[in-house]
Amino acid sequence: MKFVDEAVIKVQAGDGGNGVVSFWREKFVTKGGPDGGDGGDGGDVYIQADENLNTLIDYRFQRFYEAERGQNGSGGNCTGKRGKDITLRVPVGTRAVDIHTNEIVAEVAEHGKKVMVAKGGWHGLGNTRFKSSVNRAPRQKTMGTKGEIRELRLELLLLADVGMLGLPNAGKSTFIRAVFAAKPKVADYPFTTLIPSLGVVSVVPEKSFVVADIPGLIEGAADGAGLGIRFLKHLERCRVLLHMIDIFPIDQSDPVQNALTIIDELEQYSEKLANKPRWLVFNKVDLVSEEQADEIIQEVIDALGWEEQYFKISAVNRQGTKELCYKLADFMEQLPREEQEVSEEEKVNFMWDYHPDANQGEVITEDDDDDWDDWDDEEDDGHVIYVRE
């Protein structure tokens, strides 16, 4: 199945049902009083995470989703039926972003998690609600409010512990082939990897972690150049980044400049991503002498001012890959997972407030020259009940 990690859809919550003007009619009861019921609330729109899905391809074909409208009220103080909700199933790790405000409306990172993305309209009030000691035959009602309409961009973010980044042909996919059973395409030309891929590394039965491989970055990626910018978002949930550096590039470019390019693109894309734990991994050490490799590595470390961990490997020969995986597994145990806390400022405000609108909604008055003289008017559209003697 084609991997689709973005889709734009439009969702519309159901409108609220209208209140109704009605009066109780019964034999021998000349003035039964108002009995108009309220309308029903409109249905809401939700997204729900489903671990059985791994792509957003379905939302490329159907782009409009609408919840059911609430039914109008009726006589006999009958409240209209609430509109049915609609739930959109998406892969685990999907977030919904409002394309107009760029705010994150919802994010589902666990199987079964369900979040509202569009709120249904508030029901209208029937004339019974307006009855008082001075207005015993009210002809006022309110209309239901409109349901919320949103245009959303669904973004699928892969859930992985370790994210790999580097220039094209740095050896990321070769490393993937070396450490687990997945066999991504490997070749000696740039952008061999076209879509992100995931793999599970099992060091020992009780120690494992998930690695995400994305297409290589190039200079200007943060501004949209190359393929990597589209997939950088998949690294946002990774707990540690592996920065793969080719010490013997096939295009004879400078490893120092290549390393600086990646860090610069990370910082331009997201400060949060740039501040994640990051390890340097120097690949292809088998292509040069040990002294030459150490010299190149030292130049890179000095240029970056690097004081953290770094590793020397040869992915094609699996030299140093096992030790790196053990180090990563130990690091995963020590590093706690980020807890997603929603602050007051981050909470999504819907376009209209659910309860206040009930009091501020438009009041509809049915005109009549004489409210008190029309109790027995057969042309009135009030609710009539006939009772057998």
Curated annotation (Swiss-Prot):
<dbReference type="Pfam" id="PF01018">
    <property type="entry name" value="GTP1_OBG"/>
</dbReference>
<dbReference type="InterPro" id="IPR036726">
    <property type="entry name" value="GTP1_OBG_dom_sf"/>
</dbReference>
<dbReference type="InterPro" id="IPR014100">
    <property type="entry name" value="GTP-bd_Obg/CgtA"/>
</dbReference>
<keyword id="KW-0479">Metal-binding</keyword>
<dbReference type="InterPro" id="IPR045086">
    <property type="entry name" value="OBG_GTPase"/>
</dbReference>
<feature type="domain" description="Obg">
    <location>
        <begin position="1"/>
        <end position="159"/>
    </location>
</feature>
<feature type="region of interest" description="Disordered">
    <location>
        <begin position="359"/>
        <end position="389"/>
    </location>
</feature>
<dbReference type="GO" id="GO:0005737">
    <property type="term" value="C:cytoplasm"/>
</dbReference>
<feature type="domain" description="OBG-type G">
    <location>
        <begin position="160"/>
        <end position="333"/>
    </location>
</feature>
<dbReference type="GO" id="GO:0000287">
    <property type="term" value="F:magnesium ion binding"/>
</dbReference>
<dbReference type="InterPro" id="IPR031167">
    <property type="entry name" value="G_OBG"/>
</dbReference>
<dbReference type="InterPro" id="IPR006074">
    <property type="entry name" value="GTP1-OBG_CS"/>
</dbReference>
<feature type="binding site">
    <location>
        <position position="193"/>
    </location>
    <ligand>
        <name>Mg(2+)</name>
    </ligand>
</feature>
<dbReference type="GO" id="GO:0042254">
    <property type="term" value="P:ribosome biogenesis"/>
</dbReference>
<dbReference type="InterPro" id="IPR006073">
    <property type="entry name" value="GTP-bd"/>
</dbReference>
<feature type="binding site">
    <location>
        <begin position="166"/>
        <end position="173"/>
    </location>
    <ligand>
        <name>GTP</name>
    </ligand>
</feature>
<keyword id="KW-0963">Cytoplasm</keyword>
<dbReference type="InterPro" id="IPR006169">
    <property type="entry name" value="GTP1_OBG_dom"/>
</dbReference>
<keyword id="KW-0460">Magnesium</keyword>
<feature type="binding site">
    <location>
        <begin position="191"/>
        <end position="195"/>
    </location>
    <ligand>
        <name>GTP</name>
    </ligand>
</feature>
<feature type="binding site">
    <location>
        <position position="173"/>
    </location>
    <ligand>
        <name>Mg(2+)</name>
    </ligand>
</feature>
<feature type="binding site">
    <location>
        <begin position="314"/>
        <end position="316"/>
    </location>
    <ligand>
        <name>GTP</name>
    </ligand>
</feature>
<keyword id="KW-0547">Nucleotide-binding</keyword>
<keyword id="KW-0378">Hydrolase</keyword>
<dbReference type="InterPro" id="IPR027417">
    <property type="entry name" value="P-loop_NTPase"/>
</dbReference>
<comment type="similarity">
    <text>Belongs to the TRAFAC class OBG-HflX-like GTPase superfamily. OBG GTPase family.</text>
</comment>
<feature type="binding site">
    <location>
        <begin position="213"/>
        <end position="216"/>
    </location>
    <ligand>
        <name>GTP</name>
    </ligand>
</feature>
<dbReference type="Pfam" id="PF01926">
    <property type="entry name" value="MMR_HSR1"/>
</dbReference>
<comment type="subunit">
    <text>Monomer.</text>
</comment>
<comment type="function">
    <text>An essential GTPase which binds GTP, GDP and possibly (p)ppGpp with moderate affinity, with high nucleotide exchange rates and a fairly low GTP hydrolysis rate. Plays a role in control of the cell cycle, stress response, ribosome biogenesis and in those bacteria that undergo differentiation, in morphogenesis control.</text>
</comment>
<protein>
    <recommendedName>
        <fullName>GTPase Obg</fullName>
        <ecNumber>3.6.5.-</ecNumber>
    </recommendedName>
</protein>
<dbReference type="GO" id="GO:0005525">
    <property type="term" value="F:GTP binding"/>
</dbReference>
<feature type="binding site">
    <location>
        <begin position="283"/>
        <end position="286"/>
    </location>
    <ligand>
        <name>GTP</name>
    </ligand>
</feature>
<dbReference type="GO" id="GO:0003924">
    <property type="term" value="F:GTPase activity"/>
</dbReference>
<feature type="compositionally biased region" description="Acidic residues">
    <location>
        <begin position="364"/>
        <end position="381"/>
    </location>
</feature>
<keyword id="KW-0342">GTP-binding</keyword>
